[in-house]
Amino acid sequence: MGRIVLDTNCLIQSISPRSPYRRIWDSFFDGTNLLCVTTSILNEYEEILNLLTNEETAKYIIDAIVSNPYTIFITVYFDFNLIQKDPDDNKFVDCAITAGARYIVTEDHHYDVIKWKEFPGLDVVGLDEFLKHLLKISL
C-alpha cells in the first residue's frame, strides 16, 4: 500500500465509472493505495464537485472518502510554501510531505518545483504515469 495525494483535477477525472482513470479511484477503496487528505483538501474537493455536479453528488463522494478505511487524515503543522506560482496548491504538497506520501498525482505543472527539490521517496506524476504504475502492481 502506498500513500498518495491526489490533486482535485485528478480526483474529478478518476471518479466516473467510464473514465480511463477509474482504476485510480478504485485503488483507494480496495486497499491498493491510501488516500492522504487534509480538511483543506476535502474542502476544495467538495467546492469543485459542487460546481461540476450537484450538492447531493458532491456530498456522496466526500462521504465515501471520509468513511473509507483507506483514507488517512493528515494534520499539517508546517507550511513549506514550495509552490510560488499557485500558493493554493501548497496544501497538497504540505499534505504529501507530512504524510510521507509516495506520490502526488497531478497534471498541474506548478508542481514541477517538487521534481527539482530532493524529497526522498516523493514523486510527482501525472494520471497516465500513475495508472501505469497501478497496472504494473496489479499483475
Name the predicted role of every residue range:
Residues 1-18:
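Metal-dependent nucleic-acid phosphoesterase active-site entry motif
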Residues 6, 22-50:
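PIN/NYN-family metal-dependent endoribonuclease catalytic core
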Residues 7-8, 37-38, 107, 126-127:
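A secondary-structure boundary/capping signal
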Residues 10-11, 41, 110-111:
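Alpha-helix capping/helix-boundary segments
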Residues 34, 70-72, 123:
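Conserved beta-strand segments of alpha/beta enzyme cores
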Residues 39-66, 126, 133-139:
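Extended, non-globular alpha-helical segments
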Residues 70-104, 109, 113:
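Active-site neighborhoods of divalent-metal-dependent phosphate/nucleic-acid chemistry enzymes
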Residues 90, 109-139:
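Acidic, PIN/NYN-like endoribonuclease modules and their adjacent C-terminal/linker elements
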